[in-house]
Amino acid sequence: MIIHPNFDPVAIHLGPLAVRWYGLMYLVGFILAIVVGRLRLKLPHVAAQGWSAKDIDDMMFYGVLGVVLGGRLGYVLFYKAGYYFSHPLDIFRVWEGGMSFHGGFLGVTLAMALFAWQRKRHWLEVTDFVAPMVPTGLAAGRLGNFINGELWGRVTSPDAPWAMLFPGASRDDAAWLAAHQDIAAKWNLNEVFLSHQMLPRHPSQLYEIALEGIALFFVLWFFSRKPRPMGAISALFLIGYGAARFTVEFAREPDDFLGLLTFGLSMGQWLSLPMIVAGVLMMIWAYRRGGVAKQA
C-alpha cells in the first residue's frame, strides 16, 4: 500500500497571500490549453480556417469565465442544491472548493457559442478547434485534486499494488468499515484500519488523469490532425470524456451527500450518459452531413 503524501494545500506564500495548489493547477491547465491551441495552428487545414494566436487568447478569456461560472453553478445545482438554496451567500465561497466538470462543460459551451457569434463562425467550428485543448486542462485539475488528497476512490483490497491510504478519508473509512464488515473480513481490512486508521482506496484522481487527460488528449490530437466533418471532433470529445468518466466513477467514491442513485450509478455517471448519447448522435450527423469547416 502507498500512503498519500498529504501535501500542504498551499503551494506558495506571498506575504498575506496564499496560492493554493488547486488554483495553481487551474492556471497550469489554461496555459497548457494555450500551448496545445498554438500547436494546432501549425496544422495546414487548421491554418486554412483562418485561426490565429489572438483567437486563442480571446477564446481563453471566454473559457475561463465559462469554467469558473459554469463549474461553480453546476456544483451548486447538480450536487448540493438544497444546501445552497438555504445558504445562498456560500455560493460565492469558491475558495472552499466545489466545482463540477459537467457544469464547467456547459459554461464553456455557452461561452464558445458567444465567441462564435461575435466572430461570425459556426459554433461547432469553434468547439472542434477547442476540443483537443481541453484534456490537458482536465489532467491538471485532477492533479490538483490528488495533491489536495480529495475526491479519492472507493475502498479496495490492500493487496492491490496501487492501493493508497488517504489521511483525509479517515472519517469516511471508519463509517465504511462499520457498514461493510463482510468485505472487511474478506480483505482483512479491520487489521489494516487498526494499524493505519485508514483504509486502502483507489487513487481515482490518477485514473482520471490517465483516461480523461492523457488518453483523451492523444485520441483527439491524432483524430484532429486530418480534416474532419464539422462537429466530428466535438462529438469524439463528448464520447471520449463521457466514457472515461463513466468508467472511472466505478472506482471513485460517490459524494457522501448523494451516494449512489438509480441503478447504483453515481451522479457523475448519470451526467456522463447524455454526453455519450449526444456525442454518438453528433458523430452520425457530422459524417452524414459531410464536408469540413469552411476555409478563411
Curated annotation (Swiss-Prot):
It is a multi-pass membrane protein. Its main location: membrane. A 1,2-diacyl-sn-glycero-3-phospho-(1'-sn-glycerol) binds at R142. The chain crosses the membrane at residues 17-37, 59-79, 97-117, 230-250, 265-285. One of its GO terms (cellular component) is plasma membrane. It comes from the Bacteria. Catalyzes the transfer of the diacylglyceryl group from phosphatidylglycerol to the sulfhydryl group of the N-terminal cysteine of a prolipoprotein, the first step in the formation of mature lipoproteins. This is Phosphatidylglycerol--prolipoprotein diacylglyceryl transferase. It comes from Burkholderia mallei (strain ATCC 23344).
